[in-house]
Design a protein with these regions (language model features):
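Typically the conserved alpha-helix immediately C-terminal to a functionally engaged Cys/Sec
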Residues: 65-76
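Short active-site neighborhood of thiol/selenol oxidoreductases, capturing the structured segment around
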Residues: 47-59
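N-terminal amphipathic/basic-hydrophobic helices that include classical n-h-c signal peptides
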Residues: 1-27
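Structural micro-motif
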Residues: 98-107
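Non-catalytic, surface beta->alpha helical segment in thiol-disulfide oxidoreductase systems
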Residues: 110-143
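Thiol-based oxidoreductase modules, predominantly thioredoxin-like and allied folds used
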Residues: 32-33, 56, 79-93
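Acidic/histidine-enriched, glycine/proline-rich intrinsically disordered or flexible terminal extensions
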Residues: 136-160
Length: 160
């Protein structure tokens, strides 16, 4: 799982959890290794005005691997927004029953309200425009499976 920190421009990579104990890290800049800090970042999600962008991808997906650098650049350019990268297999304990038909799939929330759920072109400019559009929305209205709608609560429970 990758979580950006809206308080800074650095992005941590958290790989594999075992009941909240982190088991490894990637080559990326690591901001936090403490579960309390991850919980604090996820608490940011509950603030009604906070925008959260979740990329649902897979490590084996070449498109996802190419898209990841673009996703990180968008996160660095928008420190006011929380960005979360979930690997649907490595983070299956969090993703649960979310059915991803193609990659990358994005879920964008304002607080717990889902604004957008769908496949995106893996282009930085396309995703940046989508994020900007969703940032200007004040309320949700995207239809999606229950597992997607409840993802904010699932993540918070996972790190509780």
């Amino acid at each position: 799982m990758l979580v950006s920190d809206p308080r800074s421009r650095r992005i941590p990579k958290i790989v594999g959890t075992n009941n909240g104990t982190f088991t490894g890290f990637s080559h990326m800049r690591v901001l936090t290794t403490a579960p309390d800090e991850v919980r604090e970042l996820l608490a940011h999600w509950t603030e009604g005005s906070s925008l959260v962008v979740v990329a649902l991808c897979a490590a084996w997906c070449d498109t996802c691997n190419e898209f990841r650098a673009s996703f990180e650049r968008i996160a660095e350019a928008r420190p006011d927004i929380l960005f979360v990268w979930l690997d649907i297999e490595d983070d299956s304990d969090v993703c649960g029953d979310i059915d991803v038909e193609n990659f990358p799939t994005l879920a964008i929330y304002r607080g717990d309200a889902l604004l957008h759920f769908g496949i995106s072109l893996p282009q930085q400019s396309t995703v940046a425009r989508l994020v900007d559009e969703m940032a200007s929305r004040s309320a949700g209205g995207s239809a999606a499976p229950d597992a997607v709608v409840s993802l904010p609560r699932t993540l918070r429970r996972h790190f509780a």
